[in-house]
Amino acid sequence: MTQSLPPKNIVFYADDDLDDLELVKDAFAQYAKDVEVLTATDGSKALSYLSNLKKYDTIPCLIILDVNMPVIDGKETLLRLREMEHFQEVPVVLFTTSSQPIDKNFAQRYNAGFITKPIDVKQMEFIADKFIDHCADDIRNRIRRQMQ
């Protein structure tokens, strides 16, 4: 019997700011070696990638969206994700420079987290820690379903 490695935790992050993309990738790389951060630079590319995942592909256990992106912004991306069956329950965090109540309310209405930029590596590590446990639970549940 061949024993396979456990699936890697996937975090998907869409942001047009390359510095922010690197900050998030670095924080997850330092904090959790079993997390792979996949990225896109706008909502359209994010939706294209996510909608093309096949049945047996690893679904991200966390999606982080910048609110102010070109082509399709983070809010519209969130709305479209919530319409997709595989992503209705996946945790999403809106990551933005805005601290406006209307943006926070939007995130709450669509069951998403809300984090205001700028943040530093220490804050990002805290955020990574907060969501890694969820990713681990998600992976365990997927393995159980596959074994049934």
Model features per residue range: what roles?
Residues 8-28:
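Conserved acidic segment of CheY-like receiver
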Residues 15, 61, 65-66:
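Active-site residues of response regulator receiver
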Residues 39-62:
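Acidic, metal-coordinating helix/loop segments flanking the phosphotransfer/catalytic sites
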Residues 69:
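Receiver (REC) domain active-site loop signature in two-component systems and cognate sites
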Residues 117-118:
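A Lys-centered signature of the CheY-like receiver
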Residues 133-148:
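CheY-like receiver
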